[in-house]
Amino acid sequence: MKNLLFVLSFFLFFSCEALVKDEPVKELSATAQAIKNYKETFEWSKGFESWSKVPTTDDYHMVAPLIGLEATGAAEIEEIIFGFVNETELKQELVDIVELGSYITCFLKLTTKTGETFDGVEVFQVDEDGRVDKIWAL
């Protein structure tokens, strides 16, 4: 019986080692890297100027349902979305960025000029040419 317990203990010890091996860290695509750089260097006063370095389609669309904002194309995005960003002096801290297929997701800590802080998530859908086509700010 002691031998059986020893063998079972030995078997359990080695079979309970980590089954998940560390995956090598995947490098971000050029578009995801551009978004990451934009988020990490974000200044509300230069928001659209910095954002314009990220590749987008001509008629890319953004919606921020919690604050009632929606815009299509660079001119509307600059006026509506970045108008809000400038008005609120919105600060963004990138917590994490994840890329999966044609989606890039940013997890953010946001702070307004009044000191209000909240968590946010932005999901970017990228087309087959690596250009941002849709953005959901949640």
Regions flagged by a language model, labelled:
Residues I35-Y38, F42-S45, P55-T56, I81, ...:
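Hydrophobic alpha-helical core bundles mediating ligand binding, dimerization, or RNAP-core interactions
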Residues V54-P55, V126:
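Conserved catalytic core of Hanks-type protein kinase domains
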